Structure formats: structure tokens, C-alpha cells
Amino acid sequence: MKIAVVVHDYLPRHVGGTEIHAHQVASELVRRGHEVVAFSTERDLEAPEGDLRSFELDGVRGTEMVHQREYADVRESWTQSLAAETLRSLLARERPEVVHFQHLSLWGSRGIAIARERGARVVVTLNDFFLLCDDAVLLDPELELCTRAERGECSQCLRRHPLRPERWLDAPQGLELEEYWERAALERYEWHKRDLLLADVVVCPSRFLADRFLAAGMLRESQVRVLKYGYPGERHAPRPSDPSQPLRVGYVGGIYPSKGVHVLVEAMAQLAGEPLELSIWGALDWFPDYVAGLRERAAGAAVRFEGRYPPGEVDRVLQGFDVLVVPSIWYENMPLTIQEAFRNAVPVVTTDLGGMAESVEHERSGLLFPRGDAAALAAALRRLAGDRALLQRLAEGHPHVPQLGEVVDQLEEFYAGVRSPGAAR
């Protein structure tokens, strides 16, 4: 079977959960004898927008399109006319039987309709809330949980896009500008809703995420397949924690506000002088002002900023922890780091919210704490530091973590299956 995988960014330059998962699936499909082509984008201010470049990684042949990610009119951020026409030509050239969209950012949801026009089966994986929320995390500008996206009331967040005034000759002003943003927000919602309803199968890694899209009217239940991520590598047995040593607390992932790293650092500041130490792993150069604030608040606490790590070394990093903390202040979907921790028999302390709460059973595979509550997080960590028997029980109580092969088995069924009942033609 010939399969096209479409994603906004790709390895090795972009090392995020979606990019890693997309490539792991693609390379496993190649190993099974399928022909896989990947389409991605790359920002390059020195190259003309729309330029195409070839790459190959682990048997996956790919094409990346230069995309400068700036728009004269905010509507371009979802219509993506250049990207859509580029995708049309790539699909005409490659003629895949299946198109699997791992992320629609920078390509635009119109790609779903284009793939259908080509006669391909269409599978979409919703790795976050991007089609529902322009910022993908369902937070308002004050970092509070947002429910307006389900009604297409996103005008405030749309204003964040970089515009090119020199190309925007008829820019609206005053009240007209306010109306423009309101209309644009509703148009974005309707645009994505229309296109997503065309997909044959929509893979949702968590039930929580599926329910949010269903509530917004952007999916039919008949399209939905809830399928957790799968992971290569062996499962590890629990390791005892030495009560004579400080509790080794770890964080792995993006270091920016929605990930709630400030909540964890504040908790550690409250625990200064107690037998705990924290290692923070992740890129320190993406949000330098935020990181500077974290360093300032961490002064005097046992906190180390470790920086990046190669994706292939996640087991080594996780096995250096007694407990992983996932303190995100947004809903998350199905955090890869939680599942990786379970595969390594590392218990998890995480926010009682969204996909995190769906992943971790309180008092069985980890502990939950209220969103943004540093004092509650500190209390949970203090409890684990003083009760290593509890820590061991939590390490032994992790749920089954699917292997990559199990997940690709399911995807092959989706690829080969008939179109969903009631899917648009």
C-alpha cells in the first residue's frame, strides 16, 4: 500500500511529540513493506516560499515545502492557498492510496478535501486542539482555560499572527476591524468543521479530546477511533527507590508557560531544604524570558536545568527519575511523556485535567493535583519522598502501554477499511 503522511514539521530538525510519533509510525510502515512518502514544511527566510526540497530518513522518502509562516490576511493561516495547491500537486505526483494527516497546521484542512478528490482514503490524527483552537492549547491570553473556541469566538487569539502590512492594502480600521476579527474567528471554525467532517477516520489519542471535538460539532461519532500512542522499545520493571537518598523528581518536555513548568519550580521552591531534587529536561532557548524567570525562582532550591536530550535517550533520562511530574495548565491530549514513564515503570504526578487525568489513575499509577496549585503539588511530592513504599506501589500500578506495533496494526486496518458510514462523498 502507498501511504502519504502529512505533518507540519519533521525530524530531525523538529523534535516534538507529534514529529516523533509521525516518523515512528511511518518507519514502522516502511518496515512492513508499505511505500511511505512524507510531506512537511520548513521555515527558511533565505528561500522562496513554496520551494520544494527532498529528504529521506530511515527509509521514509519525503518532500518539505518552504513556508515562511507570515500572513498578509489572517485568513491565510487556515486557507493556506499555496500549501493546498502544493499538496494537490504532490498527491498527483505520488498517487497514494491513503493520506494520513498527522497535523494540519501550515498545510490547512483543505488538504482533506483535496485528498478525497484524488480518491484516497483519508485518516486524520488529532494530536492537539489546533483545528478547534488557533493556539492549539485552549487557553486564553491570561493562560486561563478557554471554552470560547467551541463557539468560534476566537478573535482575541487570532490577532497574534504576524501580518505583512505592506501586502494588506485594504486593512480595516476601528469598529470595522473588530468586526473583521469576529467574522474571521467564525470563518476559521466553519472552515475546519466542514473539512474535518470529510475524513474517513479521525484518530483521537484520548477520549477527552474526541469529546471536545464532538461537542463542537466538528466530528461525527462514526468517524472517531480512540487509539493511544504506541511506543518502540522494551517495557521495564519497577526499580526500588533508595529512601536514604533525595527523591529524584523529573520533568521532560517543552519549557514554556502552557506546560506549567513554573508550577513545578514554585513547588520545589516551597520544598527547599527537604530531601528532593529536580531535573528539568528540554530546550532552554525557545522561551528565554520564561526560562530566566524559572531560574530566578529556583534559586536556593535543588533544581537543575539539563537542556535537550536526543529522542533515542528518553529511557536513560526517565530511568534517572523516581517520579515524573507533568504540571501542564492546559488540557493536554495524551501526553507522550506519561506513557513513556509508564513504559519505564516510573510513577507520574500530574494535573487533574483533560488527557492527563484520563492517563493517570489517582493513587494507583500516580497522583493528581489541582491545576496550577503549586502547594498541592509540593504536598504530593513531600508525601512520596517520605513514603517510598507508596512510590513503589504506584510504579507497579501503571496501565498497559501499547507497543508501536500494536498501534500500527490498528492503523493498517483503518487504512484498508471501507469509508466510514455516512462519510461525505
Residue ranges of predicted features:
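A charged, aromatic-enriched C-terminal amphipathic alpha-helix characteristic of glycosyltransferases
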Residues: A389-G417
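Nucleotide-activated donor-binding/catalytic signature segment of Leloir-type glycosyltransferases, i.e.
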Residues: V291-G312
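Conserved acidic donor-binding segment of nucleotide-sugar-dependent glycosyltransferases
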Residues: H362-E363, L367-A374, R383-R388
